[in-house]
């Protein structure tokens, strides 16, 4: 190998061989390969990710959403205690609430008995007996009434038993409307087969009229409504 290298060195002037690798020669196209060139640097990455300002803004928005969600969860939790200020606020709201018939205008009695015939034998015919089923049916049959579409929708779904599936509070609202149109000061009113729940009882007494008594047949003595009125000493067994 050594003699071979010497022969190559003697074939031409050193300057001629160096010219082959000169920049000028490569520029003119004499040689296409660049032996001494450095590898090209990779193109800079396109950093299109979110900047710091965007990340900071998203963090703030997330914190706000979390706080609002926590507040809503707290509101939905049952309240077992109230501060003195909250208690006074609630009591003031109750005092400002005015029933449709203030105390003393009507004598209203609830009855868990459905049959008005038996009640009339006990209480007489002078009282105004109101059947909630008939009241609701009258509004369902009135095409001009704003509740007619809703009542017929519930009726088409549940049939004759639809009274049990009315939206919460609707029965009390319809009874209040009926009594406003048909009751006069001094009337003695008996509402048959009502209330169906303690919620209905409280809503009625807050928004329509207070009730002086709950008439209870023997088979309904264990109902929640009966027990509720027993605590306030307003129940009477039939």
From Swiss-Prot:
Keyword Transmembrane: yes
Membrane topology: Single-pass membrane protein
GO cellular component terms, A-Z: mitochondrial membrane
Chain segments annotated as transmembrane: 49-65
Lineage top rank: taxon: Eukaryota
Localization annotation: Mitochondrion membrane
Record has Mitochondrion as a keyword: yes
Family: Belongs to the AIM36 family.
Name of the protein in question: Altered inheritance of mitochondria protein 36, mitochondrial
